[in-house]
Amino acid sequence: MIKIDLITGFLGAGKTTFIRKYAKYLMDSGKNIGILENDFGAVNVDMMMLQDLMGDQCELEMISGGCDPETHRRRFKTKLISMGMCGYDRILVEPSGIFDVDEFFDILHEEPLDRWYEPGSVITIVDANLEEEMSEEENYILASEAASAGKIVFSKIGKNLKTEKEAQMEEKESIAKAEESISKVLAHINIALKQIKCERVIEEKDCLCKNWDTLTKADFQDLMSAGYTPENYQKLDFEQDSVFESLYFLNKKISVENMKKAAEELFQNPDCG
């Protein structure tokens, strides 16, 4: 049976960046992989960022956004059926940052998918500098994704390092600085889990805290075998469109400096929420 890994994580946590590294490891190991991208918005930006991975060992597929839940579920299943005929060794699914993890497991139990696929690892990407102030809906998404994770991978630790030696030195310093922040994030996650009536408690052993530029074969092998943790929790009913929105800047000729200035003005403008 083909194993499917689910890579979850809140909006902007770093899922696509992680998938690039994970996919490269799998291809270097001789595996043929498929990557299924699903974006909440109508334009799949993440797929654009992965285009250069396409080749003999890697194919990209996408589920278009902007549809109702039932249509999305049907498209998800149809895409997995077609991918099941391509002879992949492993499939990576990157859902949107506001994905219901139960949908993944429910679909894999439907025919004919239950004869072709089995869940691999559920890997949840969490920003090591996660905001402390989050809405009820944001905390719910964070907790629901962490609840089923076989491994939680912290992102944005020791970024933009130049050499392996420098990476190792700065990684230690970065991890030392991040320990307090990560402890706070773990506490935040566990509080969010309690709020949705989930009995799971995330511990350090459930996490990978490391600069991604220094990830080893052993790290990736551990992630491949991380599996998942089936947990029960209380669902929060809310409409995605009423809580989260997508903004697009397509073919807009603007300098980096002007873009930064515009972004700062948006965040400082109370009318933007």
Q: Where are the predicted features?
A:
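Short amphipathic alpha-helical segment that frequently serves as the phosphate-/nucleotide-binding helix
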Residues: 16-20, 139, 179, 260-263
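Nucleotide-state-sensitive switch-loop elements of NTP-binding domains
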Residues: 2-135
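Conserved phosphate/pyrophosphate-binding and hydrolysis machinery centered on Walker-type P-loop NTPases
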Residues: 98, 139, 249-253
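Flexible active-site lid/hinge loop adjacent to a nucleotide/diphosphate
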Residues: 132, 136-148
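Short amphipathic alpha-helical segments and helix-helix/interface helices
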Residues: 23, 80, 94, 143, ...
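C-terminal accessory "lid"/substrate-recognition subdomains
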Residues: 148-273
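Short beta-strand/turn micro-motifs at beta-sheet edges
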Residues: 48, 139-142, 233-237
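A short alpha->loop->secondary-structure connector
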Residues: 109-117, 142-146, 179
